[in-house]
Amino acid sequence: MGLMEPMRPMGLIGLMSLIGLMGCTSEDTEPTEKLTPIELMGVVTQYEEATEATRAARAYEANGATRAWTTPSGYTAIGAGNHTIGAFLTQNGQEPNEGFFYSNGSSWHTTLDIETPGNFYLYGYMPHISGVTCTISSSAAANDNSSYSSGAVLTIRNLPAVTANDVCVLVGAKNGWNDYKDNADYSITGLRRGDFAYEVVTGEGKNKVFLLFDHIYSALRVRMKVDGDYNNLRTIVLKELYVQTSASGIVTKKRLDATVTLRATDGSDDTDPISNIVFTPVGTDEGDGTILGALNDPVTLTTVDSEYMSHFMPQGVDKLILTSVYNVYDKKGNLVRENCKASNTLILNQLFSEQDQTRRGCRYTVNLTIMPTYLYSLSEADLDNPTVTFTN
């Protein structure tokens, strides 16, 4: 695969958490205090909403912040959740210090061991998930640590092509301890895209990390419901929902490597810190991914939309195939038909305006309705084996 040109997201959304971070020996052990405790906040760009051919885009709703603060212009704070951020503290001419920021949803910790204060350049990615590794250099040459002040190249290996996780890279960092006021609104001066400089200082409570992230994947939001008249006759229980992507008729491979070139700027203009991204397929297995995510139990669909999110590698993708597996019951609870399977092919430029291929940082919303082909002249087979149709 070749290069994917970077795109500038239309809007920005924030991910904000403020929790004490202490260094520890590993992700699985209790944290032990290091000489330089760290506290973390982060924001991530909002998805650009793909405009449907027949109606306007919706705004993305964010969850509330856990503390009052004045966000950078154009950003909105959301909750911390469960995240693991792969991080590299770098200095020109030095080996990078690699570690993680990780949260269980209520507190943050770090594996970074920072014993000497100083000026660093902070790079990273999220989420760090099982089986994924990452290396860094200051140029395309491996093991080049000469000029992190100018940017970096992250190579994130073995990423799933379709995943429940929002895959992002760090595009800006700052030490903001001068801006923080406990239990009060505060602003973050100088937090800018393309500025990776971060100062580690001595003194308890002074290392507050502010991080900016940007998406390198696209997002797919699927809304499913049952036709109202049909819902009076049958109950639909959704068991599986998964997506497969393809580019120019070639199905995307299951795993890939992402090489992301970042350039440092002073943040004074609209230059995108993501210079380019190369996605390289790994292995020969064709990919598909479950959209249902962490839901282990089947879902009874109703006439109200059930919503599911997934993320996928966007390079060259012009078609998505959604497959749903469900059981059909009568209104007495008797199983009528098991493991019905329906596949729907989404041709991008037929459903979304002026888009022949998916773009990173863009979210695509698809509405699906389960209904029989001819509701008012039903054969028994049609009643018990309904189709799934796009209703965008």
Model-based region annotation:
Residues 297-350:
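Extended, compositionally biased non-globular segments
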Residues 25, 340-356, 363:
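Aromatic sugar-binding interfaces of carbohydrate-active proteins
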Residues 197-204, 212, 217-308, 318-319:
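Short helix-loop boundary/capping segments
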Residues 12-18:
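Sec-dependent N-terminal signal peptides
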Residues 20-23:
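C-terminal motif of bacterial Sec signal peptides marking the signal peptidase cleavage site
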Residues 1-11:
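Bacterial N-terminal signal peptides that target proteins for export
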Residues 92-102, 250-258, 332-345:
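Surface-exposed loop/edge segments in extracytoplasmic proteins
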Residues 28-237, 300, 316, 323-325, ...:
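Short, low-hydrophobicity acidic/polar segments
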